[in-house]
Each structure stands twice: as structure tokens, then as C-alpha cells.
Design a protein with these regions (language model features):
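Short glycine-/aliphatic-rich beta-strand segments at the starts of folded cytosolic domains
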Residues: 3-14
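Short, charge-patterned binding micro-sites
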Residues: 3, 41-61, 92
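Amphipathic alpha-helical assembly/interaction segments
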Residues: 11, 33, 37-41, 53
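Short beta-strand elements
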Residues: 36-43, 83-89
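C-terminal binding/interaction regions
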Residues: 21
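C-terminal structural segments of small proteins and small subunits
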Residues: 57-93
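A generic structural motif
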Residues: 12-16, 59-61
Length: 93
């Protein structure tokens, strides 16, 4: 079993309030539901224009986990283009 975490940092320049930020994150999380991954906001909860998402995937092979999380990163950029400032992939098992 392979477990991996994708850490994605976002900068949301058009967010003027936490409500605006939450709308963007909800849109992203809803679109990621089709990938069968767990998604949570892990940092910057009280900052309007920044967000960090932790996305976890589990599979039997490292190649499948890596491909799945690469697809997730592509989907985030497709849903909200230009907002991703940094991504980091970490294997836990």
C-alpha cells in the first residue's frame, strides 16, 4: 500500500473576504471529489488571499498514486487557473 500527500498552496488575489476564499476552495474541493482523494484546508485558514490544501491518495502502487495526484494538480489548475503557487508531493508509506 502506498500513501501520498500532495500539499498545494494557492494565492487568491480576487478574494476580498474569507467568504470569497471559501467559495473558491469549495469549487476546487467539489471538482476533486471525482478523484477519490481526501482534501482538507491545512494552513492559512484566517488569511483571505492564501490557502493551503492537503490532498491524500492511497493505492497499491506508487505509480498509480503519483499519476492520480498529478491529475488532481492539473484539475486544480483547470478549475482555478493561475492560483497555484507551490506543490509538494510526499510519500508516507
Amino acid at each position: 500500500m502506498r500513501v501520498a500527500v500532495l500539499h498545494v498552496e494557492l494565492f487568491i488575489p480576487h478574494a476580498l473576504s474569507l467568504k470569497d476564499k471559501r467559495m473558491v476552495l469549495r469549487r476546487v474541493k467539489d471538482r476533486l471529489g471525482k478523484f477519490n482523494v481526501a482534501v482538507a484546508e491545512v494552513e492559512h485558514q484566517d488569511v483571505w488571499q492564501r490557502a493551503a490544501l492537503g490532498i491524500v491518495a492511497i493505492s497499491t502502487t506508487a505509480a498509480h498514486v503519483e499519476q492520480q495526484l498529478a491529475s488532481v494538480a492539473d484539475e486544480i489548475d483547470r478549475v482555478e487557473p493561475g492560483l497555484v503557487t507551490r506543490t509538494e508531493l510526499e510519500y508516507l508509506a
